[in-house]
Amino acid sequence: EYPAVADIDVVNALRESAGALGVTAHTGVVQSKDSFYGQHSPGIMPVGYELMNKWEAWKKMGCKASEMESAALLIVGAFLRVRVGACFLVVANQERAAAGLPNPEVHDTDKAIRVAIEAVKKLIRT
């Protein structure tokens, strides 16, 4: 296993771009997984107990989100010696839903795309 870590310049460009555009953004560790239903329906999986225990551990450690792509991109970027980071759109929050809190689904990618474009512009200039 190899640690999947974003390039700090990419992270900073994304943060600065979000701020400049007035877009709410969070920075931190995310969990990359290879099984969508392993997170959303762990009870149907053969190792459901293990998946649930791991998710609880990630939450306790302050994990911001769970997704399925960034670790591979970050590791390939490290191998190729290119700068890589990630900008996510949170579609829904299963923890809010489980707690009975409002959990609106958001599918509008416009803000995330604008943040990414502005960040790339910053990175090109540096």
Where are the language model's segments positioned?
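Glycine-rich phosphate- or other oxyanion-binding loops that anchor nucleotides, phosphorylated ligands
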Residues: 1-126
